[in-house]
Amino acid sequence: DSLGREAKCNNNAGGCTKIYNPVCGTDGNTYPNECMLCVENQKRQMPVLIQRSGPC
């Protein structure tokens, strides 16, 4: 859908993988991977969705 999809946020207690698999957030920022977007969402009031796979 055009609004984006929620990131799949598994338990990130162990930290995020270093694998570069970029996703474009609905905030216009490119995140290194879905997990890093999840970590950012934990700091926000309004979660960022994934607009598309790949860099913005």
Swiss-Prot record:
Keywords: Disulfide bond, Protease inhibitor, Secreted, Serine protease inhibitor. SUPFAM superfamilies: Kazal-type serine protease inhibitors (SSF100895). InterPro entries: Kazal_dom, Kazal_dom_sf, Prot_inh_Kazal-m. Disulfide bonds join C9-C38, C16-C35, C24-C56. GO terms for molecular function: serine-type endopeptidase inhibitor activity. It is found in: Secreted. The record marks Y20, N21 as: Necessary for sperm binding. It comes from the Eukaryota. The record marks K18, I19 as: Reactive bond for trypsin. Residues 3-56 form the Kazal-like domain. One of its GO terms (cellular component) is extracellular region. Serine protease inhibitor which exhibits anti-trypsin activity. In the pancreas, protects against trypsin-catalyzed premature activation of zymogens. In the male reproductive tract, binds to sperm heads where it modulates sperm capacitance by inhibiting calcium uptake and nitrogen oxide (NO) production. This is Serine protease inhibitor Kazal-type 1. It comes from Equus caballus (Horse). The gene is SPINK1.
